[in-house]
Amino acid sequence: MIDYDKINEYVARVKELGMDSAAITDHGVMYGVIDFYRAAREAGINPILGCEVYVAPGSRFDREVGSGDDRYYHLVLLAENNQGYSNLMKIVSKAFVEGFYYKPRVDLELLEKYHEGIIALS
């Protein structure tokens, strides 16, 4: 996760290292993507937008303490294109509205429904 107050420093360092692309993957949120996108574009850097989502072991709707469903796993998702960005926003929004249990969680159902244009890292 990158602190969005440090985005300009991050982009400057990417430029200094001669890289032409860089990604941002906040944990469970996408608060920094707009600022990062603007700063990267201004610097001639290709911005790759993403999110490190929390994946529930079962359903995102499960809330029973001690059932093992209070755990979660990390998964990095990157938007490959505009459709992917739109789907990533839907996934993250639904994680908060429908899956929030200590953290905003997604499940396989959400990932299957909104997979188009998304690159998942393992």
List each language-model region with its residue ranges:
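Phosphodiester-processing cores and adjacent nucleic acid-binding clamps
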Residues: 1-122
